[in-house]
C-alpha cells in the first residue's frame, strides 16, 4: 500500500501558516492532498460552563487533544478513514458533528503547536516553521478574530498582550528548532515555498 507523506506546518498565530499551506497544496496538483488543521482538535469542553470555557487558555498546548490527532494520523497512514472533530468557536467547545476524512497522498498538519509534541513530530516527514514579525501577526489576528469570530477589538488586544504573546514566547517560538526549514514572510516567500514543494514532491514519488 502506498504510504502517506505527512507535513507539519507551525508558527505563531497570524504568521501566515494558512497561506503557506494553500500555496503548497496548489503546487502539489496531481497528488491527493488534504489539510488536517490542529484547530479541529481543541479539547471537548462540554462539561464546563460557558463562563468557565471563556477562562480557558486556548494558546497553551494543553488546549489541544493531540492524542486524538495522533491516532487519526496513524489510521490515515494505515489506509483507514477517520472521523475528524469540528469545533464551535461561538460556544467554545467541540461540535457534535464530525467530518469523514479519507487517506491522501499528502496530509498537511497545520497549527501553532504542530511541532510542539514529540510523538506528533515523529510522524512528520517534513517539518516547517513559518516565521513572521510580531507586529504583523497581531494585525492579522485582530482582523481574523473580529471579522470571522465575532470578537471585539479590545478583547483581541487584551488576549494578545496577556495570553497570546507570553504563550508564543514560551511554547511556540522554541519549536522553531525542530523545523527542517524556517520560512520567513509566510505565504509571500515564493522561493522557500517552491523549494519545499520540490522536496515534498520527491518524497511523494518515493512512497
UniProtKB/Swiss-Prot annotation:
Main subcellular localisation: cytoplasm
Catalytic function, reaction form: uridine + ATP = UMP + ADP + H(+); cytidine + ATP = CMP + ADP + H(+)
Assigned keywords, A-Z: ATP-binding, Cytoplasm, Kinase, Nucleotide-binding, Transferase
Pathway: Pyrimidine metabolism; CTP biosynthesis via salvage pathway; CTP from cytidine: step 1/3; Pyrimidine metabolism; UMP biosynthesis via salvage pathway; UMP from uridine: step 1/1
EC numbers, comma separated: 2.7.1.48
GO cellular component: cytoplasm
Example of a GO MF term: uridine kinase activity
Subcellular location: Cytoplasm
Single biological process term from Gene Ontology: UMP salvage
Record InterPro entries: P-loop_NTPase, PRK/URK, Uridine_kinase, Uridine_kinase-like
Pfam families, per database record: PRK
UniProt feature coiled coil, ranges: none
Residues involved in ATP binding: 11-18
Family: Belongs to the uridine kinase family.
Protein name, per record: Uridine kinase
Organism: Staphylococcus saprophyticus subsp. saprophyticus (strain ATCC 15305 / DSM 20229 / NCIMB 8711 / NCTC 7292 / S-41)
Amino acid at each position: 500500500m502506498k504510504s502517506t507523506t505527512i507535513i507539519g506546518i507551525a508558527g505563531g498565530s497570524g504568521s501566515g501558516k494558512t497561506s503557506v499551506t494553500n500555496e503548497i497544496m496548489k503546487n502539489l496538483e496531481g497528488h491527493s492532498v488534504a489539510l488536517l488543521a490542529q484547530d479541529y482538535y481543541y479539547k471537548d469542553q462540554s462539561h464546563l460552563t460557558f463562563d468557565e470555557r471563556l477562562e480557558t487558555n486556548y494558546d497553551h498546548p494543553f488546549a489541544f487533544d493531540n492524542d486524538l490527532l495522533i491516532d487519526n494520523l496513524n489510521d490515515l497512514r494505515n489506509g483507514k478513514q477517520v472521523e475528524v472533530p469540528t469545533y464551535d468557536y461561538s460556544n467554545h467547545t467541540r461540535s457534535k458533528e464530525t467530518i469523514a476524512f479519507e487517506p491522501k497522498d499528502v496530509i498537511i498538519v497545520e497549527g501553532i503547536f504542530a511541532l510542539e509534541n514529540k510523538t506528533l513530530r515523529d510522524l512528520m516527514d517534513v517539518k516547517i516553521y513559518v516565521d513572521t514579525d510580531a507586529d504583523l501577526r497581531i494585525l492579522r489576528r485582530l482582523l481574523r478574530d473580529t471579522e470571522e469570530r465575532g470578537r471585539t477589538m479590545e478583547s483581541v488586544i487584551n488576549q494578545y498582550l496577556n495570553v497570546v504573546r507570553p504563550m508564543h514566547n514560551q511554547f511556540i517560538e522554541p519549536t522553531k528548532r525542530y523545523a527542517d526549514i524556517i520560512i520567513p514572510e509566510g505565504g509571500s516567500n515564493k522561493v522557500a515555498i517552491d523549494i519545499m514543494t520540490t522536496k515534498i514532491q520527491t518524497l511523494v514519488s518515493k512512497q
